[in-house]
Structure formats: structure tokens, C-alpha cells
Amino acid sequence: MSKRKAPQESPNEGITDFLVELANYERNVNRAIHKYNAYRKAASVIAKYPTKIKSGTEAKKLDGVGAKIAEKIDEFLATGKLRKLEKIRQDDTSSSINFLTRVTGIGPAAARKFFDEGIKTLDDLRNNEHKLNHHQKIGLKHFDDFEKRIPRKEMLQMQEIILDKVNNLDPEYIATVCGSFRRGAESSGDMDILLTHPDFTSESAKQPRLLHQVVQCLEDCNFITDTLVKGDTKFMGVCQLPCESDQDYPYRRIDIRLIPKDQYYCGVLYFTGSDIFNKNMRTHALEKGFTLNEYTLRPLGVTGIAGEPLPIDSEKDIFDYIQWKYREPKDRSE
């Protein structure tokens, strides 16, 4: 998951901006994930509202906007600012911790530890690089590039390289670029790829070579430039498009997950998102007597105990089982 905020094309950009800022404060400083989720949900719903919101009362009609958020919207619309945010921005602890978490590899706990040691800025991090782990050093090295959104045109170029290399390695591989890119977004925070192969199922032994040989192939062609984490089923790293005569492309974050073939399409559905769409689909599945997660779809018995995973060979199979009309990825940005 990227730490960059998506650009807004909403008539309510000011409202969504302050909600996202409050969300990040609750997650990074207060560690209040429930408040983070509430602010993010409200921001997502308001971002899709087609007209300019004129009052908190109007906003409260939207699912996910409660009385407290509506009050903040009224304050923002009346004054152009929010007292709570002004206070947060003036607080050295809050602003420093929020900033440090923008470095990939630095979570809220590490950010607070660095802050307690007097490390508050990028220069402070550079002067204390011996305290950083490998992941954090790479995050610091490429901080400016990782802050930039990835235009869809660049995502398409990277997708072409990845799919071509994977297919040449073994045509039985299946790879899908997920996230907001698959939903048609004009920009993305990072490259999130799901990978599978018929040799790897939930019943078989682990097959780390299936992931590692793909990573090696992408390293050999100089597309993957750095490794952050490489396990049996997940790779986290850095990639870069080949430089052109008039352009050096930024370094980008890339994640590749190897998923058992029989769980692949539940994974594709989940990692395509959006978060709200996934929650709505899980709720609908429960109403129809199924439990759905990123791994499987299982029928629920009369006692509420889940049965064996159902066979799934496409995303559409999942929609069909739970009797929900299929929605293309571009129609899942709720």
C-alpha cells in the first residue's frame, strides 16, 4: 500500500484533504485505527460526490459521514480551516511523526522512536543512517521518487514489461496488476502484482522458486533495482523503467505476491479493491450464506461454521455464487 495521497478531481477537494490528514494523524500518532478508517471512508464517499457540498447536514446524508464529521465540515466551510488540524500542525510531535511515516519502511512505532531520539527530518535520518534498517535506507534514498504518483501511461509501460517477461519465462504463469490501476485510475501509488502458477496450490508444498525466478528475471533486465523484502510468497522492492535519451524515469515501489492457483481469483478481487467495495461484497456474501476473504469463498452451514472452499476459476465465479451482478474493475471504486 502506498503512502501517497491520490490527486483529487472532486469539487470537495478541500474537505477530502482535511479528512485524509486527520485520518493519517489518527493512524500514525494516536494509533487509533477505527478513527483512521472512519475518516478514510468519509473522504472516499465525499470524493465521489458529484457536486460541491454546502453544509454538514448535506454531507451527513452520505453513508459514512456521521455527526462529528459533519460538524467539522461545517467549521471548514465557514472558516476555510479546522481548529483541530491547526493545533495538530503546530504540534512538533504530531507533525514530525506524520512526516517520518512518509518514508517507506518507517511505520508509526519506528517514527515515534526516531522522534524520541531527536530525529525529525530527512537530514536527521541521513545523519543517523546507521540506525536505519535496509528497508528504511532504501526508502530514504528514493524518498523524492516514492512521493510522486505514477501516471497511468507509465503503469501501462511497466505492466507490458512484467507480463512479457513472465510469459517468456513460463507461459503457464498468470500475472495481474491490481490496485487502483486495475480500476482505471489515472495515477497509482505503486505497482502491485499478483502471480500464480498451476504448480502451486493451497494443497501443495511451498514453491518459492516460482516467485524467485520471476524476480531474478526482472533483475536481470535491470527493471527491478533494489530488494526490500524477499520471502517465499512475497517480494517487496524497487523498479524503474529503462531510461530514454531525454528522460530518466523515477524509481517506483513494486510488490509481487505469489498466490496458490485455487485462491488466485479471490486474491485478485481483494487486491483490486476498493476497500469499501470489498466490505460491501463480503457483507452481501454473508447475507447469501457465504464467507468471503482474500483466500477463499466458503458456504456457511446452519450452525454458522464455514464449509470447504468453493472451486473458483474467475472473478465472475465469485459474483455468481453470491448472486451479485458482475461488476467490471472500473466500476468498483466505491
UniProtKB/Swiss-Prot annotation:
Mg(2+) 2 binds at D190, D192, D255. The active site is at K72 (nucleophile). Residues 183-192 are annotated as: DNA-binding. GO terms for biological process: base-excision repair; DNA damage response; DNA replication; double-strand break repair via nonhomologous end joining. Binds 2 magnesium ions per subunit. Repair polymerase that plays a key role in base-excision repair. During this process, the damaged base is excised by specific DNA glycosylases, the DNA backbone is nicked at the abasic site by an apurinic/apyrimidic (AP) endonuclease, and POLB removes 5'-deoxyribose-phosphate from the preincised AP site acting as a 5'-deoxyribose-phosphate lyase (5'-dRP lyase); through its DNA polymerase activity, it adds one nucleotide to the 3' end of the arising single-nucleotide gap. This is DNA polymerase beta. It comes from Xenopus laevis (African clawed frog). The lineage of its organism: Eukaryota, Metazoa, Chordata, Craniata, Vertebrata.
